[in-house]
């Protein structure tokens, strides 16, 4: 048997749902999708859900992962085994841990490939900081997986599809975290997963102010701006949501233009699926040139304005 009898899908990030649904179609005969509102439910049915389970009644101060109890109860009531697919977001991983405990299921995070052999999930994901790919065969009846972005293609909606809708009512867990305050995060995040062209900056750009040069190039060619992990987490020059690498974004654009990025394996794991990689770095021995299809050795601060002017013609 090369499919599960059923799969359960949930995404706290609506933009990740189409990819998870496409994966679900390949892995199971019946697709169940947990959603938070009617709009997401309608989308899930168009993407292939046979049954939609609307999670309802959570107090505003409680967290999404507190639905884990009623989600696990629903899953158990409808089969003695099954596959659970979640995005590898922070909240997705929190929910995965709680579901794993309640279902007595193995949990595998950041899956980059999933298949079914003899009714059991086989999962591949990066290990040793991206230096190798590990393969796990999950032996428990239930398997809970968080999926890396780009693992599956995106499912296309079909308005003619139909499905059944159910309601799952909130039940307060015995132990829970209560939200006491919410502070809006200053962010200009974009959906980089869908970007066709990406300009990504590393610390070789020199300063936060110099990132404006990359932004001008983005405007000239219609690209989105990304960065390396040190730019986001060490220097705090850009938002966390924009960094590319094994522990965050895994991109597959048509063009990935790496500016001042050394090309360490942890970063390239998130970029080497790009159709074309173009590198700009003043160090001719930078590892990035081993991955690049095209490269320029030189100072990015001088090259970017000239490149922008040429491409804007």
Swiss-Prot record:
<comment type="function">
    <text>Required for anaerobic carnitine reduction. May bring reductant to CaiA.</text>
</comment>
<comment type="similarity">
    <text>Belongs to the ETF alpha-subunit/FixB family.</text>
</comment>
<dbReference type="InterPro" id="IPR023461">
    <property type="entry name" value="FixB"/>
</dbReference>
<feature type="binding site">
    <location>
        <begin position="255"/>
        <end position="283"/>
    </location>
    <ligand>
        <name>FAD</name>
    </ligand>
</feature>
<dbReference type="GO" id="GO:0050660">
    <property type="term" value="F:flavin adenine dinucleotide binding"/>
</dbReference>
<protein>
    <recommendedName>
        <fullName>Protein FixB</fullName>
    </recommendedName>
</protein>
<comment type="pathway">
    <text>Amine and polyamine metabolism; carnitine metabolism.</text>
</comment>
<keyword id="KW-0249">Electron transport</keyword>
<dbReference type="Pfam" id="PF01012">
    <property type="entry name" value="ETF"/>
</dbReference>
<keyword id="KW-0285">Flavoprotein</keyword>
<dbReference type="InterPro" id="IPR029035">
    <property type="entry name" value="DHS-like_NAD/FAD-binding_dom"/>
</dbReference>
<dbReference type="InterPro" id="IPR014729">
    <property type="entry name" value="Rossmann-like_a/b/a_fold"/>
</dbReference>
<dbReference type="InterPro" id="IPR018206">
    <property type="entry name" value="ETF_asu_C_CS"/>
</dbReference>
<keyword id="KW-0274">FAD</keyword>
<dbReference type="GO" id="GO:0009437">
    <property type="term" value="P:carnitine metabolic process"/>
</dbReference>
<dbReference type="InterPro" id="IPR014730">
    <property type="entry name" value="ETF_a/b_N"/>
</dbReference>
<dbReference type="InterPro" id="IPR001308">
    <property type="entry name" value="ETF_a/FixB"/>
</dbReference>
<dbReference type="GO" id="GO:0009055">
    <property type="term" value="F:electron transfer activity"/>
</dbReference>
<keyword id="KW-0813">Transport</keyword>
<dbReference type="InterPro" id="IPR014731">
    <property type="entry name" value="ETF_asu_C"/>
</dbReference>
<dbReference type="Pfam" id="PF00766">
    <property type="entry name" value="ETF_alpha"/>
</dbReference>
<dbReference type="GO" id="GO:0033539">
    <property type="term" value="P:fatty acid beta-oxidation using acyl-CoA dehydrogenase"/>
</dbReference>
<comment type="subunit">
    <text>Heterodimer of FixA and FixB.</text>
</comment>
């Amino acid at each position: 048997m090369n499919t599960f009898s059923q799969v359960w899908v949930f995404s706290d990030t609506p933009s990740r749902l189409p990819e998870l649904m496409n994966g679900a179609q390949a892995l199971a005969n019946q697709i169940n999708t947990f959603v938070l509102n009617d709009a997401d439910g309608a989308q899930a049915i168009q993407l292939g859900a046979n049954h939609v389970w609307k999670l309802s009644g959570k107090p505003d101060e409680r967290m999404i992962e507190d639905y884990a109890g009623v989600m696990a109860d629903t899953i158990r009531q409808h089969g003695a085994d099954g596959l659970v697919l979640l995005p590898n977001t922070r909240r997705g991983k929190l929910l995965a841990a709680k579901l794993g405990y309640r279902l007595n299921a193995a949990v595998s995070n950041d899956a980059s490939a999933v298949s079914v052999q003899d009714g059991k999930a086989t999962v591949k994901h990066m290990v040793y900081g991206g230096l190798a790919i590990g393969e796990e065969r999950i032996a428990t009846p239930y398997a809970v997986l968080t999926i890396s972005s780009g693992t599956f293609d995106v499912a296309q909606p079909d308005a003619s599809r139909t499905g059944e809708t159910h309601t799952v009512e909130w039940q307060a867990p015995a132990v829970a975290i209560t939200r006491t305050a919410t502070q809006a995060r200053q962010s200009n995040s974009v959906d980089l997963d869908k970007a066709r062209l990406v300009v990504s900056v590393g610390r070789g750009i020199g300063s936060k102010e110099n990132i404006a040069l990359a932004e001008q190039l983005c405007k000239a060619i219609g690209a989105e701006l990304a960065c390396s992990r040190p730019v986001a987490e060490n220097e705090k020059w850009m938002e966390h949501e924009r960094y590319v690498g094994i522990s965050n974004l895994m991109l597959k654009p048509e063009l990935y233009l790496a500016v001042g990025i050394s090309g360490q394996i942890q970063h390239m794991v998130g970029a080497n699926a790009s159709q074309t990689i173009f590198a700009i770095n003043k160090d001719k021995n930078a590892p990035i040139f081993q991955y690049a299809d095209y490269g320029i050795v030189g100072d990015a601060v001088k090259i970017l304005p000239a490149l922008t002017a040429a491409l804007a013609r």
